[in-house]
């Protein structure tokens, strides 16, 4: 086994396992421990559950350390099989459901796939999210300037500062129609807001990045090029930040933030509603 791995961590569900992963990762991030993550979705029958149990037990036998198991399983028979394993098992949903049951004075009605599955109750939200993703893809990197008025936010920035991944995350996670527009090297001699963006200034949000980080990212894409040179990166970042200040466009330095953090900060600063899917 890998000596750098302190614990093996399983995320198990009879659905997508997204909930188990998200909550499990949040918990594990509180501890200074190296982990080997194993995600097992759609554990929906006894034969698969027994195979998962065997996998957990095998790791225990090999390492002598109990694997950590975060699970979200509503089928009692499946859950019982996992609980018989040699893992340290934590029902991440039940830990919250039990106290709420007393507060609400209601019994839960657990259904597999309810959180991330497609069902009549969430079809409208699902369709809205797909529409947001389609819109965002069609308006990535300035591909199209049509229907920009339908965007909820328009991200600006130099090439490789994080516009595309942030736009896609906003669309996929929150159902936000996010367009993005790049400022390229040819724009820098006379950098101004494009005419199509001026009437939509209330939707504009700028991204910037430290020149050193930008140069490193670009170097991976175009090695030893003017595009990746420190001089070029410093100049572009300086010009774009000056444009943001001149036009009073809210902006964020993305250097030390994850895509998730950037997107959340944009939602907060722009006053956009968070719609979780």
From Swiss-Prot:
GO terms for molecular function: ADP binding; ATP binding; phosphotransferase activity, phosphate group as acceptor; protein serine/threonine kinase activity. ADP binds at residues 157-164. It comes from the Bacteria. Its EC number is 2.7.11.33, 2.7.4.28. Keywords: Kinase, Nucleotide-binding, Serine/threonine-protein kinase, Transferase. It catalyses: [pyruvate, water dikinase] + ADP = [pyruvate, water dikinase]-phosphate + AMP + H(+); [pyruvate, water dikinase]-phosphate + phosphate + H(+) = [pyruvate, water dikinase] + diphosphate. Bifunctional serine/threonine kinase and phosphorylase involved in the regulation of the phosphoenolpyruvate synthase (PEPS) by catalyzing its phosphorylation/dephosphorylation. Belongs to the pyruvate, phosphate/water dikinase regulatory protein family. PSRP subfamily. PANTHER family: PYRUVATE, PHOSPHATE DIKINASE REGULATORY PROTEIN 1, CHLOROPLASTIC (PTHR31756:SF3). HAMAP family: PSRP. This is Putative phosphoenolpyruvate synthase regulatory protein. It comes from Enterobacter sp. (strain 638). The lineage of its organism: Bacteria, Pseudomonadati, Pseudomonadota, Gammaproteobacteria, Enterobacterales.
């Amino acid at each position: 086994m890998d000596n750098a791995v302190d614990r093996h961590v399983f995320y198990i569900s009879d659905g997508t396992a997204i909930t188990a992963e998200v909550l499990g990762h949040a918990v594990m991030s509180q501890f200074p421990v190296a982990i080997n993550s194993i995600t097992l979705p759609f554990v929906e029958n006894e034969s698969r559950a027994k195979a998962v149990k065997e996998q957990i037990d095998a790791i225990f036998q090999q390492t002598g350390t109990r694997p950590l198991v975060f699970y979200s399983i509503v089928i009692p028979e499946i859950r019982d099989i996992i609980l018989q394993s040699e893992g340290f098992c934590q029902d991440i949903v039940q830990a919250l459901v039990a106290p709420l049951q007393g507060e609400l004075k209601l019994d839960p009605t657990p259904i597999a796939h309810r959180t991330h599955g497609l069902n009549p109750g969430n079809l409208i939200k699902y369709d809205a999210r797909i529409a947001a993703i389609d819109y965002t893809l069609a308006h990535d990197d300035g591909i199209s300037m049509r229907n920009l008025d339908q965007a909820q936010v328009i991200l600006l920035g130099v090439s490789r500062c994080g516009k595309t991944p942030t736009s896609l995350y906003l669309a996929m996670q929150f159902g936000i129609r996010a367009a993005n527009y790049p400022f390229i090297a040819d724009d820098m001699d006379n950098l101004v807001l494009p005419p199509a963006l001026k009437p939509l200034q209330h939707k504009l949000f700028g991204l910037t990045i430290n020149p050193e980080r930008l140069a490193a990212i670009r170097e991976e894409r175009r090695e030893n090029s003017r595009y990746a040179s420190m001089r070029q990166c410093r100049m572009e970042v300086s010009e774009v930040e000056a444009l943001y200040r001149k036009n009073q466009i809210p902006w964020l330095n993305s250097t030390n933030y994850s895509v998730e953090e950037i997107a959340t900060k944009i939602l907060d600063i722009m006053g956009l509603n968070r719609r979780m899917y």
